[in-house]
Amino acid sequence: MGLSDGEWQSVLNVWGKVEADLAGHGQEILIRLFTAHPETLEKFDKFKNLKTPDEMKASEDLKKHGVTVLTALGGILKKKGHHEAEIKPLAQSHATKHKIPVKYLEFISEAIIHVLQSKHPGDFGADAQGAMNKALELFRNDIAAKYKELGFQG
């Protein structure tokens, strides 16, 4: 399940492009998540009232949350699978406070892949997509394992 050095390099290469515009990428990823899976909006009191992509685009709170999400994910990706210290508090908050099911992490992973494909087609070919999918699956599996330890049936 682990990634090779080359795969991690591919992941971090495209992630550098994400970090160049965290707000733009984060906003686009969350809009994609919320429009493709409207049920995910119910987990966000701040965003429940946003019904259209235009309303979502106009929300500064949504933009800020996108930065928060991608900053945390970037920190995890840069650990190249050695992310225990980063995963533990994230799993704790998402299991006990936010009650985010693992399925929703799959949905946001799909949104990340989609947005990276559309924004960076030259840097996100099949190999890079495969590597990113593996990295996101590793992240989800480790979150799911922590959820289980916490007794959360997410």
From Swiss-Prot:
Globin domain location: 2-148
Q: Where does O2 bind?
A: 65
* Location(s), subcellular: Cytoplasm, Sarcoplasm
Chain positions with Phosphothreonine modification: 68
The protein's UniProt keywords, in alphabetical order, are: Cytoplasm, Heme, Iron, Metal-binding, Muscle protein, Oxidoreductase, Oxygen transport, Phosphoprotein, Transport
Q: Transport: present as a keyword of the record?
A: yes
Question: Modified residue Phosphoserine is at which positions?
Answer: 4
Which residues are noted in the entry as nitrite-binding?
Answer: 65
* Main location group: cytoplasm
User: Has the keyword Cytoplasm been applied to this entry?
Assistant: yes
What is this enzyme's EC?
A: 1.7.-.-, 1.11.1.-
Residues binding heme b are: 94
BP GO terms, sorted: removal of superoxide radicals
Q: Name one GO molecular function term.
A: metal ion binding
Kindly state which reaction or reactions the protein catalyses.
Answer: Fe(III)-heme b-[protein] + nitric oxide + H2O = Fe(II)-heme b-[protein] + nitrite + 2 H(+); H2O2 + AH2 = A + 2 H2O
Entry GO terms, CC: extracellular exosome; sarcoplasm
Assembly notes: Monomeric.
Recorded family membership: Belongs to the globin family.
Q: What does this protein do?
A: Monomeric heme protein which primary function is to store oxygen and facilitate its diffusion within muscle tissues. Reversibly binds oxygen through a pentacoordinated heme iron and enables its timely and efficient release as needed during periods of heightened demand. Depending on the oxidative conditions of tissues and cells, and in addition to its ability to bind oxygen, it also has a nitrite reductase activity whereby it regulates the production of bioactive nitric oxide.
Record PANTHER family = MYOGLOBIN (PTHR47132:SF1)
Name by which UniProt lists this protein: Myoglobin
Write down the species: Perodicticus potto edwarsi (Potto)
Phylogenetic classification of the source organism: Eukaryota, Metazoa, Chordata, Craniata, Vertebrata
